Amino acid sequence: MGPKKLASVGLFVLLTFTYGARAQQSGTSVAPSPVWNDNSLIAVQKTGGDPARPGDVRIEFYGHDAFKITSPVGLTVLTDPWRNDSTGDYPKWFLTEFPAIRVDIVVSTHAHFDHDAVDRPKGLVVLERLVGQFKLGDIEITGLADKHKCEPTPPDKASTPADLHMENTCPPNNVIGLDNAIQIIETGGLRIAIWGDNRAALDASLDHYLRNVDVLVLPIESVLTPVEVDAIVHKYDPKAVIPSHYFVKGLTTETSGVESPDEWVNDQKKGHHAEVRRLESADLTLNTTELKGSHHRIYYFGSHFEKE
């Protein structure tokens, strides 16, 4: 994708630096500001925070792979805001534009249009394809560099110029759009891994980061196959799984080719005897108590998504 103007000019951070002091016992909430600026970030820089300290973590689904995560002290992280392709290589995927919501941190996994609209939300800190560690208050984000899933399209099956180009760009000689950085967000004593569109068999050196994550957000059906998803869940053994990157009624177009994970979700309940919670809104609150003793519990937002 081409370069974009970012809404947070002047507020970038060095991705490999730790930002903000760690307070051993900080329960201070971030006070909302009537003016949208970095006052709240300055405040939390002073008070610090501990990502490992248990507390309520709010997760709101904005469709596709976009989730707004609110920490116990009130800091917000938005993952992978989406847009429609501007090159003409792909049909329209989304029926609307991503809402211009205010968040403290925006982070993306890779440079594809359905994940990289970092200029749409009003973010104070923008972390495009973060690799390394970033800390602010009671949030710590770790980006793991790996590769996007890639399956070359045979020339006789290609339907777009992008399909033809893909044949010669799969890793390791890939274009930047097929780099992917899994993002692990730690807050409230929970570790939440945003897979992005990463390949199923990632570099073995990264395995220890993902083993026993609390929540694993996986692109089911439209990127990873059900067999690949099951293998990933078995390998890393999360307490909970949240499907992402799927067809959402009222948001995703039929021409996108993005599919529903319903079959996989149903199979988990019947064939794997997993606990499935079909959510009745786009809003979920998790904490260490809620997930205690949980084993691969599925939280499925379905077609509920936030619009503003």
What are these regions (language model features)?
Residues 41-54, 62-107, 115-126, 131, ...:
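Pre-active-site segment of Zn-dependent metallo-hydrolases
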Residues 19-23:
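Sec/Tat signal peptide C-region and signal peptidase I cleavage site
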Residues 165-237, 247-249, 253:
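Active-site-proximal loop/helix segments of hydrolase catalytic cores
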Residues 177, 240-308:
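Binuclear metal-ion centers of metallo-dependent hydrolases, dominated by the metallo-beta-lactamase
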Residues 1-9:
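Bacterial N-terminal signal peptides that target proteins for export
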Residues 9-18:
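Bacterial N-terminal signal peptides
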